[in-house]
Amino acid sequence: MAACRYCCSCLRLRPLSDGPFLLPRRDRALTQLQVRALWSSAGSRAVAVDLGNRKLEISSGKLARFADGSAVVQSGDTAVMVTAVSKTKPSPSQFMPLVVDYRQKAAAAGRIPTNYLRREIGTSDKEILTSRIIDRSIRPLFPAGYFYDTQVLCNLLAVDGVNEPDVLAINGASVALSLSDIPWNGPVGAVRIGIIDGEYVVNPTRKEMSSSTLNLVVAGAPKSQIVMLEASAENILQQDFCHAIKVGVKYTQQIIQGIQQLVKETGVTKRTPQKLFTPSPEIVKYTHKLAMERLYAVFTDYEHDKVSRDEAVNKIRLDTEEQLKEKFPEADPYEIIESFNVVAKEVFRSIVLNEYKRCDGRDLTSLRNVSCEVDMFKTLHGSALFQRGQTQVLCTVTFDSLESGIKSDQVITAINGIKDKNFMLHYEFPPYATNEIGKVTGLNRRELGHGALAEKALYPVIPRDFPFTIRVTSEVLESNGSSSMASACGGSLALMDSGVPISSAVAGVAIGLVTKTDPEKGEIEDYRLLTDILGIEDYNGDMDFKIAGTNKGITALQADIKLPGIPIKIVMEAIQQASVAKKEILQIMNKTISKPRASRKENGPVVETVQVPLSKRAKFVGPGGYNLKKLQAETGVTISQVDEETFSVFAPTPSAMHEARDFITEICKDDQEQQLEFGAVYTATITEIRDTGVMVKLYPNMTAVLLHNTQLDQRKIKHPTALGLEVGQEIQVKYFGRDPADGRMRLSRKVLQSPATTVVRTLNDRSSIVMGEPISQSSSNSQ
C-alpha cells in the first residue's frame, strides 16, 4: 500500500493499478492523520526571480499537493496555479499523450460569467491559444518513447489587469514538471519581450503592451537554448527582432536558475518508467538491412510527388514489416512499426545532411513553384488563390458593418484586456486537403492556432480607420506543408483584390531543420536549414519555423521545435534565410497584383453617414425604434448612431443604400418647417388631449408636438379640459424655434394672454383651475 494515493473526498486509497481498493473502516482515520502530518512536515518553498523592474515569485508545496507536481507563479497580483499528473502505466497510444489545458476563471477577475448559467462553459480562443503555447514549450523535453498519459492543468487564480498570465502559466508548467517525479528534461523559462519607444522591456504590463511594436514570447532551456518562439510585431526590422530574442533568452536563464534552486531544495527524484517505447537496436539494424536501399531510391527519385512518394514508402513499409514479423515473432507490434520509422527518418535525414539535396530535387534554399490568382469569383468582395508546390489555399474577403465585429464581454475584457475586433482571419483545413475522410464540424485547436498566426501576420498592415469589419477566410484545398504561411500570402492577395488599402503586401514561409547530434555530449554538431519545407520534411525534421512579414520587416513568427533546445545561432540563421525567401515570394505575388485596387468592387458594401437633426430624431427612430427596425428589415442595411445628430448607415450593396436613402429622405421630409419664423404667431390644430397638455399641428404633414399645460394659459391648470379645449379646435400659438438640448419645437399659447390678476380656491376635479377666474366655453373660443 506504500505506492497508493490517498483521496480525502471519498476516503479511499487508490492503488496505481486501475482497480479501487477500500481500506477497513478502523484504518481510515489513522491514514488521514498520517497524510496531514506529511503535509505539515513538508512545508512550502518559494523563490523570487528579478527580471529587470519585474519580480517573478515561484512557490510550491501549499496547494494541490496530491498532484505529482504543482506550483503557483505570481507577478504583481496575477497568479497562476499549474499541476502536472502522469500515469505510471503506459498508454496504448503510439505517441506522447500529453494534454495541456489553460483555464481562465471569471472569479480571478472578480466577475461573474455573463452566460445564462453564470458559470464557465466551453473553452475560449484565448485559452486554447495559450494552451498551445504551453504545450509547445514543454513537449520537446519529455524523453523519447515516454508514452504515458500526462496532463498539465493551468488554473488562473487571480488577475490584476496589469500583468499577463500566459507567460506565468508556461513557467508554472515548467516548475510543476520539474518538482514532480515525472521524467522530464527541464526546466524551461519563459518571458515576454516588448519594444516601447525603442527600449526592450521584459514582461511589459498590459498598458505598456498597448504601445509596444513587438509581442514576443521566448521559452528557453538551460545553456541559452531556445525551445519555443511566438511573436507578433508591427513590421519591425529584422535586426531589432533578433536582438529581442537574445534579450529574452538572457532573462529565461535567470528563471531557469530559480527553478533549479527550488528543485535542489526540494530534493526531487524522478521515477523510472516501466519502459520507454523505443525499438531494440537489433530490430532496427535488421530493418536497416531490409529497407535502406529501397528507401534511398524513393527519396532520391525527384519525379515523385506527395501522393506517389507516400505510396512508394508505404509499399516498402508493408513488405518490411512482414519480414520483421517473421524474423522477430515475439517482438511488440510497436517495435516493428517504429523500427521502420527510425530507418526511414535516418535515410531521409542523411540525404539532406550529406548530399545537400531534398526529396523533390530542390537545394536547401530553393522555393517550390509559386503561382497566384485574384478575383476568382465576381460576386465576392475579394478573393485569391495561392499555390505553392502542392499546397493550395483559397482566400476570400468579406466586408460587413462595424457592428459585426467580435465583441468582448466584460469578463473577457477584465481577464485578457481584449476589446472589440474588426479584423479576423478564419482558417479551415478540411480532410480532403490530404485525401482523407473526417469530421468537418466544429473547430479544432490546430485550425484555431494556424488561423491566429496568419491573422497576426496580416493585422499590422490593416488600416485602423477602415469603415468596415473585415473577415478573411482561408480554406486549404491541398496541403503539403506550410499551409498557415500560404494563408498569409493568399490573405494578402485577397485583401488587395478587395480594395483594402493595406500598407504593404505580406508573405510567409516555413524554415525546417535537420540536425546531427553528438551522442556523447548531446549537442548539435552539424545541421541544415531548409527553405519552404514539405510535409514530409516537417515530419522527419527537427523544426517548423514559420515567419511572415513585408519587404521591410517582420509581422509574425512561430517556432515549433522538436529538440530539447537549439542554439541562438541557428535561430538567427533561420530568420535570415526566411527573409530572403520572403522577398522572393513577394516579387512573385507583386506580378499578380502589386497594390490594392483603387476602389472596392461595384457590388460591394457601402457605408454613409446621415445627418438627422434633433427635431427629426424621434420621427426617424419611431416609437420603440419601429422606423429603424422597419428600415433595416426592408432594405437589409445596418444603422448605428455616431453622435446626437449623426447616424452611420451600412448597406450590403449600393442598391440597398439607394433604397435606404430614399426611405430616410421620405420619413424625415418636412418642407414647411423651414418657413416658420421665430416669434411669429400661428394657428394650431389640436389632434389629441393628454393629461400633460395637448398635441397640436401647425400644418397638415407635420408630426404633432406637445403644448404643455404650463404653456396653455397664464393660470396654472391640472388638465386641458379645464380650459374647454377639444380635439379639432384651432388655437393661436407663438413659435420659439427648437430646444437646442433635445430638438423639440417650442410653442406657447400663454404668452398671447394677459397676466392673471386674481386668485381663487383650488378645485380637485379635472376641470379645476388654480389661478384666476373660471373660463367659460365661449370665452375660451374667443381667445
Curated annotation (Swiss-Prot):
Enzyme Commission numbers on file: 2.7.7.8
Residues annotated as domain S1 motif: 679-750
Primary residence: cytoplasm
Entry-linked InterPro entries: ExoRNase_PH_dom1, ExoRNase_PH_dom2, ExoRNase_PH_dom2_sf, KH_dom, KH_dom_type_1, KH_dom_type_1_sf, NA-bd_OB-fold, PNPase
GO terms, biological process: cellular response to interferon-beta; cellular response to oxidative stress; liver regeneration; mitochondrial mRNA catabolic process; mitochondrial mRNA polyadenylation; mitochondrial RNA 3'-end processing; mitochondrial RNA 5'-end processing; mitochondrial RNA catabolic process
Alphabetized PANTHER family for the sequence: POLYRIBONUCLEOTIDE NUCLEOTIDYLTRANSFERASE (PTHR11252), POLYRIBONUCLEOTIDE NUCLEOTIDYLTRANSFERASE 1, MITOCHONDRIAL (PTHR11252:SF9)
Function: RNA-binding protein implicated in numerous RNA metabolic processes. Catalyzes the phosphorolysis of single-stranded polyribonucleotides processively in the 3'-to-5' direction. Mitochondrial intermembrane factor with RNA-processing exoribonulease activity. Component of the mitochondrial degradosome (mtEXO) complex, that degrades 3' overhang double-stranded RNA with a 3'-to-5' directionality in an ATP-dependent manner. Involved in the degradation of non-coding mitochondrial transcripts (MT-ncRNA) and tRNA-like molecules.
Record's protein name: Polyribonucleotide nucleotidyltransferase 1, mitochondrial
